[in-house]
C-alpha cells in the first residue's frame, strides 16, 4: 500500500466521491478511504436525486465538472420536472434512482479514475503536529497514510448510534460499522462538535401491498436530464411509476397511544433532527389538526423486491411500526424487509470553516457533507466537489474557488453554513436564495461552466460543445427578434385556435414569446433555429425574454452587492479596537473572521450600523491598503 498522497478523502459517500474525483482529475495523487468496496455512493435513505433547489445543485455540480448528474441520468427510473406550474425560479428536476445501479456506476468511475486509490479500511484518527497542521490519517491496522490535505466526508457514520424505541446501539446506517476515532481527533484539535439526528422509513415487500387504489404519480413526458452531456432519455412509457397514499385516522391513534415508546419522545433521543424531513410521529404531534398525511410509495431498484415508504420515517419500536404500517390503505398484509430507524451522529459547527471548506484553525483539514451539519445527497455532493477542488488548489498555491450567493445554490449553502451556522440538519430550499431568479434550473451552464473550465474539470470537447450551446441560444433570440408574424399567418391562426393568443397586428417572434400564455413549442415549426434546441435551451429563451425586466433589475442589484465582496478585510484586524461596534457584532466577527465586507454584512447579529463602523475603521487604520480590491 502506498503511504504518501497529495489528498486523502475519508468516507465514500456522495461528498467523498465528488471530492476524490475532483482531486484526482486535478492530477493529485488521491486516496479514498471507505470501509467497503461495494458501499460507494449508497442511498441509505430516499432513492432519489434532485428536487426543489437540490435539483439545481445537481446541475451546478455538472457545470463545474462533477459526476453526480451523469450518474443520476444513467440510473434514473423516473424523471420529473417539479413546480412547473410556478415561476421559473423554483423549477427543479428530480429523478427516482435505481440505488443499486447508482452505487455501481460511481464505484466503476472511482475504480477507473487515474490518480485515485480506493482503500477499504477504517480511518481511526488524524495525524497532526503541534501547530495544528494535519499531515495524514491513521488506519485501523495502525498504518499511517501521509497527505498534504485531508478531507473528512464521514456522513452519518461519525460515532453513530441507531435508535428504535428505547433500544440504542452503536452502528452506522443499515447496521454497518460506525467510525469513532475521528471524533476524538477533532475534539483534541479544539473543534466544536454537535450531535444531530436523522431517520429512514421501512422498506416493504412489493408483493405484500395493494396499490390498486393509490394515486399514480408518473414522470414528466419531456426530454429532461441533469447533465449537459446526456443525450439519451428514458421514454415516459419505460419510466417506473410512484404512488401516493394517505395515512388514516387509525394511524394517528396508534401514534397517540404509543407516543411515549418513540425514541423521539421517550427521552432516548437528545439530538436535533431535520425540520423539513421529520419522523412521522413528529408530524402527528406538530400538526395535530391534520388527520392524515401524504405518503409516497417509491421503487428502489429494478433488481429488488421492495418499496420505499417515503414520508413514513419513525423511531418507534418494531411492534408499533408494524401496527402503523398495517393501518395504511393497501398495507393490511404488509411484510417488512427493513424496519425504520433513527440515527444519531457527530458533526461539526460549520462556523469553524472558511469559505473554502478548510477549518480556520486547523491547517490542511477540509470537511464536506453531513459532517458540516447538512442533510441530503445533493448538498453533500456539492460540498464535496468544492472541498476537493480547494484542497487541490491549496496544494498548488492557488486561491480557493468561492462561489457567491448570486452565482450558485452551492454558494448560498456554504455562505449560510459558515456565517449563520446550523442548529438542525441544514436543507437547501429555494427560499434561502435571494437571487433565485438568477439561479435557475435552465442556466447552470451559463453561470458556472466557465469556472469548471478554468478549474480544469471541463474538457476541451465539452467546452466547445458548450460554446455551440450558447451560440445556438443567441442565434435563436436574434431570429425571434427579426421574424414577424401577421394576424393571418399560420402561427397566428394556430395560437388563436388553441386560445394562447390573438394577434391583432404584426408581432415579432420575440414579442410573441413575451405573451405569458404562449407555448414556445408552437413557434418551433416556423423558426428553424428553434428546431435543434434542447429543452433547457428553450426554457432559457422563454425565461430571458419573458422575465427580461426582472432579470435585468436582479443583475443590477447583484452588481452593487458584488462591490461589497471586493472590500477586503485584513486578516490581522483586531475587532476589539473598532469603535462603536456592538458587543455581539465584535464576538461574531472575531469568531467567523469574514474575508470581506459582503460576508461580514451577512453574519447574524451584525447590523448595518456595525458595517458602517467597520468601514470607517478600515479606511482610517489601513489607508495604504486598497480594501476595494
Swiss-Prot record:
It is found in: Cytoplasm. It comes from the Bacteria. NAD(+) binds at residues 273-287. Its cofactor is FAD. The keyword Cytoplasm applies. GO terms for cellular component: cytosol. GO terms for molecular function: flavin adenine dinucleotide binding. Its main location: cytoplasm. GO terms for biological process: tRNA methylation; tRNA wobble uridine modification. Coiled coil: none annotated. FAD binds at residues 11-16. SMART domains: GIDA_assoc_3. NAD-binding protein involved in the addition of a carboxymethylaminomethyl (cmnm) group at the wobble position (U34) of certain tRNAs, forming tRNA-cmnm(5)s(2)U34. This is tRNA uridine 5-carboxymethylaminomethyl modification enzyme MnmG. It comes from Mycoplasma mycoides subsp. mycoides SC (strain CCUG 32753 / NCTC 10114 / PG1). The gene is mnmG1.
Amino acid at each position: 500500500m502506498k503511504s504518501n498522497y497529495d489528498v486523502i478523502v475519508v468516507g465514500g459517500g456522495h461528498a467523498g466521491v465528488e471530492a476524490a474525483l475532483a482531486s484526482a482529475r486535478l492530477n493529485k495523487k488521491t486516496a479514498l478511504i471507505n470501509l467497503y468496496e461495494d458501499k460507494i455512493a449508497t442511498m441509505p435513505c430516499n432513492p432519489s436525486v434532485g428536487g426543489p433547489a437540490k435539483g439545481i445543485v445537481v446541475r451546478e455540480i455538472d457545470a463545474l465538472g462533477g459526476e453526480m448528474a451523469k450518474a443520476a441520468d444513467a440510473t434514473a427510473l423516473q424523471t420529473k420536472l417539479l413546480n412547473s406550474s410556478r415561476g421559473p425560479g423554483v423549477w427543479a428536476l428530480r429523478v427516482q434512482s435505481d440505488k443499486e445501479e447508482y452505487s455501481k456506476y460511481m464505484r466503476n468511475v472511482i475504480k477507473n479514475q487515474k490518480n485515485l486509490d480506493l482503500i477499504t479500511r477504517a480511518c481511526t484518527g488524524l495525524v497532526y503536529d503541534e501547530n495544528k497542521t494535519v499531515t495524514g490519517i491513521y488506519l485501523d491496522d495502525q498504518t499511517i497514510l501521509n497527505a498534504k490535505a485531508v478531507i473528512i466526508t464521514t456522513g452519518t457514520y461519525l460515532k453513530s448510534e441507531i435508535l428504535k424505541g428505547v433500544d440504542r446501539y452503536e452502528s452506522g446506517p443499515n447496521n454497518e460499522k460506525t467510525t469513532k476515532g475521528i471524533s476524538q481527533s477533532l475534539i483534541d484539535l479544539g473543534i466544536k462538535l454537535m450531535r444531530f439526528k436523522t431517520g429512514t422509513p421501512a422498506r416493504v415487500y412489493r408483493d405484500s401491498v395493494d396499490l390498486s387504489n393509490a394515486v399514480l404519480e408518473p414522470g414528466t413526458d419531456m426530454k429532461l436530464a441533469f447533465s449537459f452531456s446526456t443525450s439519451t432519455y428514458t421514454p415516459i412509457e419505460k419510466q417506473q411509476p410512484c404512488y401516493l397514499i394517505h395515512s388514516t385516522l387509525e394511524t394517528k391513534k396508534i401514534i397517540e397511544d404509543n407516543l411515549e415508546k418513540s425514541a423521539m419522545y421517550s427521552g432516548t433521543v437528545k439530538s436535533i433532527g431535520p425540520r423539513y424531513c421529520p419522523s412521522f410521529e413528529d408530524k402527528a404531534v406538530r400538526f395535530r389538526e391534520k388527520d392524515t398525511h401524504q405518503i409516497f410509495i417509491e421503487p428502489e431498484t429494478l433488481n429488488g423486491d421492495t418499496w420505499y415508504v417515503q414520508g413514513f420515517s419513525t423511531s418507534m419500536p418494531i411492534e408499533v411500526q408494524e401496527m402503523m404500517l398495517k393501518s395504511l390503505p393497501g398495507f393490511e398484509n404488509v411484510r417488512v424487509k427493513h424496519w425504520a430507524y433513527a440515527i444519531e451522529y457527530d458533526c461539526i459547527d460549520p462556523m469553524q470553516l472558511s469559505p473554502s471548506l478548510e477549518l480556520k484553525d486547523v491547517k490542511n483539514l477540509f470537511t464536506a457533507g453531513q459532517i458540516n451539519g447538512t442533510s441530503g445527497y445533493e448538498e453533500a455532493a456539492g460540498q464535496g466537489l468544492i472541498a476537493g477542488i480547494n484542497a487541490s488548489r491549496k496544494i498548488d498555491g492557488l486561491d480557493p474557488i468561492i462561489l457567491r450567493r448570486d452565482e450558485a445554490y452551492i454558494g448560498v449553502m456554504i455562505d449560510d453554513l459558515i456565517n449563520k451556522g446550523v442548529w438542525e440538519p441544514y436543507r437547501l430550499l429555494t427560499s434561502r436564495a435571494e437571487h433565485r431568479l438568477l439561479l435557475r434550473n435552465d442556466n447552470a451552464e451559463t453561470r458556472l461552466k466557465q469556472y469548471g473550465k478554468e478549474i480544469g474539470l471541463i474538457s476541451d470537447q465539452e467546452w466547445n460543445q458548450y460554446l455551440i450551446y450558447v451560440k445556438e441560444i443567441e442565434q435563436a433570440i436574434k431570429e425571434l427578434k427579426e421574424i414577424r408574424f401577421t394576424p393571418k399567418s399560420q402561427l397566428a391562426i394556430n395560437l388563436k385556435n388553441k386560445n394562447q393568443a390573438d394577434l391583432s397586428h404584426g408581432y415579432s417572434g420575440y414579442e410573441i414569446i413575451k405573451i405569458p400564455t404562449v407555448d414556445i413549442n408552437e413557434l418551433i415549426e416556423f423558426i428553424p433555429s428553434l428546431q435543434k434546441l434542447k429543452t433547457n435551451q428553450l426554457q432559457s429563451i422563454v425565461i430571458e425574454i419573458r422575465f427580461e425586466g426582472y432579470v435585468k433589475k436582479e443583475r443590477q442589484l447583484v452588481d452593487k452587492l458584488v462591490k461589497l465582496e471586493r472590500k477586503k478585510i485584513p486578516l490581522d484586524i483586531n475587532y476589539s479596537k473598532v469603535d462603536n461596534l456592538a458587543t455581539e457584532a465584535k464576538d461574531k466577527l472575531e469568531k467567523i473572521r469574514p474575508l470581506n465586507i459582503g460576508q461580514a454584512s451577512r453574519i447574524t447579529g451584525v447590523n448595518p450600523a456595525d458595517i458602517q463602523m467597520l468601514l470607517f475603521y478600515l479606511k482610517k487604520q489601513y489607508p495604504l491598503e486598497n480594501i476595494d480590491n
